[in-house]
Design a protein with these regions (language model features):
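C-terminal engagement/docking regions of AAA+ P-loop ATPases
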Residues: 233-316
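Canonical AAA+ ATPase core
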Residues: 84-89, 110, 114, 122-201, ...
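Conserved alpha-helical scaffold flanking the Walker A/P-loop in AAA+ ATPase domains
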Residues: 26-30, 83-103
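Walker A/P-loop
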Residues: 32-69
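Pre-Walker A (pre-P-loop) alpha-helix and adjacent loop at the N terminus of AAA/AAA+ ATPase modules
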Residues: 2-43
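AAA+/P-loop NTPase substrate/partner-engagement loops
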Residues: 58-86
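P-loop (Walker A) phosphate-binding loop of NTP-binding proteins
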Residues: 43, 77, 145
């Protein structure tokens, strides 16, 4: 199956359930293609979990869901070794991370210790328990949902954990027309339960392989570097403790642009791909005292201020 056909099929399948969330869906598909992970944030009831489930049901892959709570332990996520009396030896019981798609629901309701249990899984695609490392089968895609930190009973994700997410996406609200359509679609049915598979795990592996081959013009590479460098030069205006985007963030920016180009049906990157993924990729990597809206304003300002040459972006 061609990559553009595959992504279109998944997008249309998700649209049977999700209303008015096309751009959110496309960003999530770009992250999947790029081999990254996604953090969905918004207040309760905006469709974060439904979107994650819709993607999982669209793919013929293993799926696990973990409801993060304050009493959840790291071993509840990664698995644990226990003494098997029948065998007279220790046996490893796999945790829910041993799957293809992991929904970490309300991740910021768990303690930082439990949140950190996902660090190695997300960064390296492996789990180490009791000194033994086990490799996770690709594709491995974490979709985490979280409520805003102002919500009671939440633990803000540490910076190292945030940096493991390729994108942080806000769900956004619904228009009156979209809300009426929501009622019409769900009044006599449950579309999510009727959603079928449109691809396989092997399709996703081939998609991620194709993403690495997406072409980027040298001028666009320089454009990304200039944008990232600019985030590190705003210390005075951004306040104390300011940190710009890390080198890992630079690579994430590249991968996200490659993924979005595939979603758009191209095998090369154009400036619009970079601009579209800039806020979801960069904002959660900016460490400082600024509010979320201020970070978005800063990134959008950089997009407008950094010079972008005009070229034939397909030319190799």
């Amino acid at each position: 199956m061609q990559t553009n056909e595959l992504l279109s099929k998944i997008e249309e399948n998700i649209a049977k359930v999700m209303i008015g969330k096309r751009e959110v869906t496309r960003l999530m598909l770009a992250s999947l293609a790029a081999g990254g992970h996604v953090l969905l944030e918004d207040v309760p009831g905006t469709g974060k979990t439904v979107l994650a489930k819709s993607l999982a049901k669209s793919m013929g892959c293993g799926f696990e869901r973990v409801q993060f709570t304050p009493d959840l332990l790291p071993s509840d996520v990664t698995g644990l070794s226990f003494f098997n009396q029948a065998k007279g030896a220790f046996t490893f019981k796999e945790g829910p991370v041993f799957t293809n798609i992991l929904l970490a629901d309300e991740i910021n309701r768990a303690t930082p210790r439990t949140q950190s249990s996902l660090l190695e899984c997300m960064a390296e695609g492996q789990v180490t328990v009791d000194g033994e490392t086990r490799v996770l089968e690709p594709p491995f895609f974490v979709i985490a949902t979280q409520n805003p930190v102002e919500t009671i009973g939440c633990f803000p994700l540490p910076e190292a954990q945030l940096d493991r997410f390729l994108m942080k996406i806000n769900m956004g609200g619904m228009s009156a027309d979209e809300e009426r359509e929501l009622i019409d679609r769900f009044i006599h049915a449950e579309p999510l339960s009727q959603l079928g598979e449109v691809c396989t795990a092997e399709d996703i592996r081939q998609l991620q392989k194709a993403c690495r081959e997406v072409f980027m013009h040298d001028d666009l590479r320089n454009y990304i570097v200039s944008l990232v460098q600019a985030t590190r030069k705003n210390r005075l205006s951004a306040g104390a403790g300011w940190q710009g985007v890390s080198p890992r963030g630079t690579l994430a920016f590249l991968r996200a642009a490659q993924g979005y180009a595939l979603v758009e049906g191209r095998d090369y990157i154009v400036p619009e791909d970079i601009k579209t993924v800039a806020v979801p990729v960069l904002c959660h990597r900016l460490i400082g005292e600024l509010e979320e809206a201020q970070k978005e304003s800063l990134v959008n300002g950089l997009l407008n201020s950094v010079e972008l040459p005009t070229e034939d972006w397909k030319k190799r």
